[in-house]
Each structure stands twice: as C-alpha cells, then as structure tokens.
Amino acid sequence: MSKDVVIIRGEALADVAAKLAGEKEIFIVQDENVAHVAAAVAAALGGVKAVIGLKTSEELKTMETAVWVTERLLQADASRGALVLAIGGGITTDIAGFAASMYKRGIRYANIPTTLLAQVDAAIGGKTGVNLHGYKNMLGAFHMPEFTFLTSSVLETLPEKELRCGLAEMLKTFLIGDADAYSRAVSSGFSAKNLDGQDKNGLPSRKNAKIQDELIFRAASIKADIVCRDPLEHGERAVLNLGHTFGHAIEHCSKGEIAHGEAVGMGIILAARLSEGLGLAQKGLAACLEKDFQRVGLETACPYGIDELASAMKKDKKDGRFILLKGIGQPVITTVKEDDLRKYTE
C-alpha cells in the first residue's frame, strides 16, 4: 500500500463535488443518522448510483454488516471502477472501507467523516475493519482511501458524547506529535460541551472557529504524515495507538457503555501513570494530563480494576506492546511485563 494520504479541506459539503467531477459510478455508504449530509452531497454531485444506509453501533460493526454492504454493491452492478463514498463517523468509514477492500478484490473508496473523531483519526490512514465477538477491529485490511474530505460544517450539531470522543483522539495525536498544538488545544477554551470555546461571559464564542479548524487539520495532518512513512504499521505508526491498549480493554469491559474516544482518554492517563512508574517520564506527567483532560470535559477515571483490564488485554492484537510517553510530544513503543502493569496502574 504505497498511495499517498490525501486530505482535502472544504468550507461546505458542496466543495467535494469538484474532487469527484468525472466519476461515473459513485455509491454512497451512509450512517442513517446523517442522511441529510448524504442527501446534500448527492445533490451537489447531481446524483449517485445508489445510497446504502447503515445503522451504526459497535455491536453492528461486524463481518455480517460488511458483507451486507458488498451484497448491495453486487445487486447494484457496481464495477471494478466504482467508488464507494463513506459518509458518517468512524464505524461507517471502517465498514465501508473494509467492504470496498473485499468487493471484487478491492475497489476505490473515499471518506467524508461527520464526527470529530473520524476527522482527526478514524477516517485517515487506510485502516478498515470490523469487530469479532466483541473485540475491537479483529478483522480488517489496510485499504487507503482516495481522499478524506474535512469540513467543520458537519460538526455543528454533534452531540456532547461525540465531541468528547473526538477531543480525546485529537489530544492523543498532539501528545505524540506536536507539543505546541497540544498546549494550544487545552488552552483555547474548547470543551466537550462547546467545541468553539467560550467568551469571558461563558457564552459560545465563534472567534475560536478558525482555531478549531486549524487544530482539526493539524491533527489530521500529523496522522497522515506518520501513515505515509509507515503505511502498514511496521514501526512508527504504532505510536498512534497511545491509550488504545488500555482503551480497547476499557471498551470491552464496559460492553459498549463507554465509547471508543472516551476509553482512549482514560487509557492515556493510565499510560502516563505507567510511564512514570517505569521511569520513562518525570513524576507529575499523569497529573498534568489529567488536569488538562478534565479542563476540556473529558472523564479521566477508569471504572475498572487491573484484573478486568488485563484479562481483556490478552485478546488485544497489539500483543503486549504499549505506547508510553517520555513527555509531551515524546512517545515510545515498549513491551511491559504484567507484574509492572499491575504495580503501576492499580
């Protein structure tokens, strides 16, 4: 997989039409919750071959759902030259991308992510896949999208829970790749309640909209750069999993009650504590991150003990590798003994 990671910024959904000019065979795979977004895109394109609607949840992110999408493509006579256009959050882009990777041994796809988490993480980099027996992304493929189209216009009505998830992934990206952007993000007044920040009276402030857009694009660009250097995750790309070893275990233990981004936020704090305990980071890092995360409205306390987490981690595909921190902007990939894991995270 040697394709470049292409990110396009747009002021409005209609801007994507220029990128898709000349495409004769577009199939939209949409999250049914954002059908209005897909309708606007289809109108801007002057029509599409078919729209395939998905009900989205971690429980429905399965091989059966991905195969169902391929069946819809087959019924609509999609050719090898077709383009799947995924419109929705990370679950939608994961399923649509995986279906595209399987159909006729691989057809093209592109993403219009409609959640903050998908814009800064899930829709970028070509990782596609589905869950297996409740374990995250056990089946999948590396299949690079033709492009990912980013516009903050689709985030204006995003629920608070979705904003929390996206903020956690955004801060994760800055923690591994840009200390200055991390500082800017936690000091700009953003929160899970109001992505644009607040003015001195505590009211929503649109003056931060430009900063918001810049930070979203910066986070997406950091991930894109890492993926270009290591598309198949043989080395550096693994740092993007900061907080994910703990996070996936938290998700599994919660049986879906704690969303992915929320779990990653909690996982980053646990990873920081482990980093301190192993002597990789100076004392105080975890407390500093915890304060920052709480400031923007993220939950930081993991509700599960290490016994429950360790059991779930044994099924994790990262095989005992942890992404830890020497400091902000200084990730390190390492293996951790179970004794140390228990000692420093209990």
Q: Where on the chain are the PLM-derived regions?
A:
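Active-site segments that bind and position negatively charged phosphate/pyrophosphate groups
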Residues: 192-194, 208-307
